[in-house]
Amino acid sequence: MKKKTILLAIIPALAFLLLSCTNYSDDNKQETDKPKENEPQDITPDDTPNDDSNNDGNTTPVDNNPVDNNPKEDKLNPMDEPYIGRQYYLNHIGDIYSAWGTYRGKGITIAVIDAGFNPNHEDFYYADGTSKVSDKSASFTTTSSGTTTSVGVDKVVNMSESHGTFCAGVAAAAINGKGVVGIAPEATLLLLKTDLKPKSIAKAFKYAADNGAKVVTISIGSYYTYEGDLVNDGSDLGTVFDEPVKYCYDRNIPVISAGGNGGQSQPTEFTFPGCVDNVIGVGGLAANSSTNIWEGSSYNSSPQYQFIDVFAPADMMFGCCHYDGKLYDGGWNGTSFASPIVAGLAALYFEKNPNNTSIQFENNLYNSCRALASQNGVQSNQLGHGRVDVTKLLNLTSSGSVTARFKSDWSDCYAYVWNSVTGTHQNSWPGTKLSKNNGVFSVNVDSSTYDSIIFTQSNSGPKTPDLLIASFINGNVYDLTSPISEQGMDFKVGVYH
C-alpha cells in the first residue's frame, strides 16, 4: 500500500537474521563484531552489563507505572505481575493500563513468525493452567525438495536461543502472577517456527492466514541496499514475499514487521520483508522515552523510501526468555521487540472492532500516532507517522466527514463509499456523479462499516486517467496522488479518520 521494492542487482547469498541485540550476564559476555556483508548475524551478547541481567526471581521490581489500572472485578490485575515494574516501555505507548480495563485481546490470535520458541514458558499459560499457545502452531523447513510444514506445539521448540520467546511474550504474555504482562495478555499465540529461509517464511504467512491469525508479527529480516537483491534460486525477494503478504492483507490480517537495526551507520539499507507492500514497518524508540528514537533503529533515509511507518519502544526491554535457568531477562534491544508491541495493539483494536478491515486498522494506527520531532540529524519526515498511542488508537471516532477531489479526462465519473470485504456500498448505486476536471465528493462515512472510497467511470469505455485525490477527514489532509496504469481499474483510497 505504501512501499515499492527496487530489484536491480544480484546478490549471491541471502541471510536472514533476528532483529535484536541482547544483554546477558557477565559470565556469558562475548564480543560482538559487525556481521560481514550477506552473512547472518547471530544473537550475540552486548559488551555492556546491565542491572536487569541477573533476574532470578528474587529481586523486588520497582513500580514505575504512574497510572492506576482499576481493572474490572472479574479480571485479574496486570499490576500484580512481579516484573511489570521493569517493563518501562509500557509507559511509552499511551495509557495501556486503562486500555486493559476493557480490552486485553480476548478472542484474537496473534501469529509470531520466528526461529523457534519455548512454548511451555510459564507466561504462556493462563492463571487457570491452560495454555495460550494454539495447537495449530507449526514449523516450516525448506530444502531443495521444497518447503515442508510440521504442525504441533512440540514442533516449534527451539531452546538454543530466546528471541522468539521474548517476542511472543512482548505481544501476549498472560496475566497469571508469574512474571510479565504482554500488550494483549488474553490473545492466543500462533507460534510459527522457520529455518529463516525466505520460502519458509513466505509459507508461514499463508499458513497464519489460513489458521486463525488476525494479525501477524515478524521480527526477522535481511538487510539490503536500494540496489536490490535476488535469492539464491534466482527469484527476487519481492516476488517471494509480495504474494503471501497480500494474501494476508486481502483477508484483513495486518502484517507487522521489525523495521531493522540499521541505525545511522546503515541509512541506505532496508530489510525484507519489512519493506514489502502492505507490511507495517516498525522502528524503535530509545529506553524510557516517548520521543527519542533508539540509536540502533532504522529510519526512512529519503522521502521516496518510506519503509518505517511507526515507532514503538525497542530499548532496555524486559521479558520472557529461557537460558541459564532464567525465565526472564532485561536489557534487550532491537526493533524485533517494537513489532510485537504493535501486534499486541492490533489485537486490542480488533477485539474492540471485530468487523474492521486491515485498511481501517492501518489508517487508524497511523492517524493515532504522535509525531516525532527531528533529532540527531534525522528529520521528522524520516520518522514515519510517529510513535504509537493505544489511547488514541482505541478512541478514534467510528465515523467522519470525507471530501475527495479529482481531476481527470473522464466525461463522467461516479464516487461511492465501499466495504471491500462485504462488497456493499453506503450510498445508492451507481453513486454520486462528479463533473469532469474538478469533481468533488463529500459524504459522512461510517468507517466502522466502510473502508474505502471508489471512483469509477460509467457509460463509456475504459480509460487511463491520472487522478489527483485529496481526502479531508476530521481536519486532516492526505495527499493521495496516483496515476492509474491498468485500464478499467477503479481507483480506491482508504478512508482515514
Mark where each language-model region is.
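Active-site core segment of subtilase-fold serine proteases
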Residues: D68-T188, K203-D236, N288, D324-K326, ...
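Bacterial Sec-dependent N-terminal signal peptides
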Residues: L17-P78, D195
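Aromatic-rich carbohydrate-binding modules that target alpha-glucans
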Residues: D409-S447, S458-I469
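Structural recognition of the beta-strand scaffold that forms the well-ordered cores
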Residues: T109-I113, G169, V181-G182, T188-K193, ...
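Hydrolase catalytic cores
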Residues: A168-A171, L190-D195, K214-V215, A314-L383, ...
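Sec-dependent bacterial lipoprotein signal peptides
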Residues: M1-L19
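Extracellular S/T/G-rich loop segment that most often corresponds to the catalytic His/Ser-adjacent loop
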Residues: D114, T271-E351, N355
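Substrate-binding/access-modulating region of protease and related hydrolase catalytic domains
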Residues: Y24, K29, W100, R104-K106, ...
